[in-house]
């Protein structure tokens, strides 16, 4: 099976072999050790996962290689131990710690977004979305709460249950529904304008313990997705888009619908709905 982090031992007699690596290697560290015989012991971290035979070819000299157990930091420290060291240690490249790849990708994007757009447009798109959201989250909005907003604010500070859907109804527009809904994003809420059920569930499944805000445009009022609302509020649903996953969550969340129309009692149980009029 392919892996990116490996440990290796290369036995030798006579002159110390010189190790050299190419662009496939992210990081390597090794030293000359002597126990019962001379050998090189080291770790190697590849930029992409590779199989056993490829790793041996990269190191050269028919080494013994094993998939790394534990963290790359622990393995790196172990192969640099002083007790059996004869010479070294030597290193190549930069250690990529767990969780640091995303930061490095973002750094590359910020350094030259146009270059990444040409080479990897999908990654550039995600990096730009992340940058824009971070800028949005930093922006502080001073809201003078209207009476309905104060009522909603107090309600979402209470403990959510597994049934109640809060329906904010304002038929005229301009009441501040969308402004309030977008502000909730800064407090970790999931924001959606609606759409197809599996599209909504796929996006929500990325972090399914978030509170939920449906900010429904007037033009979409006739296509209100009650199915998605109930599935998300019930805390058990299947997201079948791209990567199928069944999700069951113990944590209850608030679900708020901001709409220009009243709810349809033929499509959702009336006892679920708490109405706030704008």
Swiss-Prot record:
All copies of domain CRESS-DNA virus Rep endonuclease, residue ranges: 1-95
BP-aspect Gene Ontology terms: DNA replication
Residue positions of motif RCR-2: 39-41
Sequence motif: RCR-1, positions: 8-11
Motif residue range(s): RCR-3: 78-81
InterPro entries the UniProt entry points to: CRESS_DNA_REP (IPR049912), Helicase_SF3_ssDNA/RNA_vir (IPR000605)
Cofactor binding annotation: Divalent metal cations, possibly Mg(2+) or Mn(2+).
Reaction(s) catalysed (UniProt annotation): ATP + H2O = ADP + phosphate + H(+)
Effect of mutating residue 177 to A: Complete loss of ATPase activity
Annotated Gene Ontology cellular component terms: host cell nucleus
Family label: Belongs to the nanoviridea/circoviridae replication-associated protein family.
Protein name: Para-Rep C1
């Amino acid at each position: 099976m392919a892996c990116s982090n490996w440990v290796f031992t290369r036995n030798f007699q006579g002159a110390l072999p010189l190790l050299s690596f190419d662009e496939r290697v992210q990081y390597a560290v090794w030293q000359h050790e002597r126990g019962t015989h001379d050998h090189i012991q080291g770790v190697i971290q590849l930029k992409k996962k590779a199989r056993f035979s490829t790793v041996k070819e990269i190191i050269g000299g028919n080494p013994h290689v094993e998939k790394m157990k534990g963290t790359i930091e622990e393995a790196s420290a172990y192969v640099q131990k002083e007790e059996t060291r004869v010479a070294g240690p030597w290193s190549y490249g930069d250690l990529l710690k767990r969780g640091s790849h995303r930061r490095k990708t973002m750094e590359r994007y910020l350094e030259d977004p146009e270059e990444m757009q040409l080479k990897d447009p999908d990654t550039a798109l995600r990096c730009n979305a992340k940058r824009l959201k971070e800028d949005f989250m930093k922006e502080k909005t001073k809201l003078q709460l209207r009476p309905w907003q104060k009522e909603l604010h107090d309600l979402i500070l209470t403990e959510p249950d597994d049934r109640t859907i809060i329906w904010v109804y304002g038929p005229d527009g301009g009441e501040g529904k969308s402004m309030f809904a977008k502000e909730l994003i800064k407090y970790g809420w999931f924001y959606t304008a609606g759409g197809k059920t599996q599209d909504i569930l796929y996006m929500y499944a990325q972090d399914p313990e978030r509170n939920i805000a449906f900010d429904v445009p007037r033009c979409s009022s006739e296509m209100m997705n009650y199915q998605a609302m109930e599935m998300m509020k019930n805390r058990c649903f299947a997201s079948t888009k791209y990567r199928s996953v069944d999700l069951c969550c113990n944590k209850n969340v608030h679900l708020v619908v901001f709409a220009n129309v009243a709810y349809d009692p033929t499509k959702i149980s009336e006892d679920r709905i708490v109405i706030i009029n704008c």
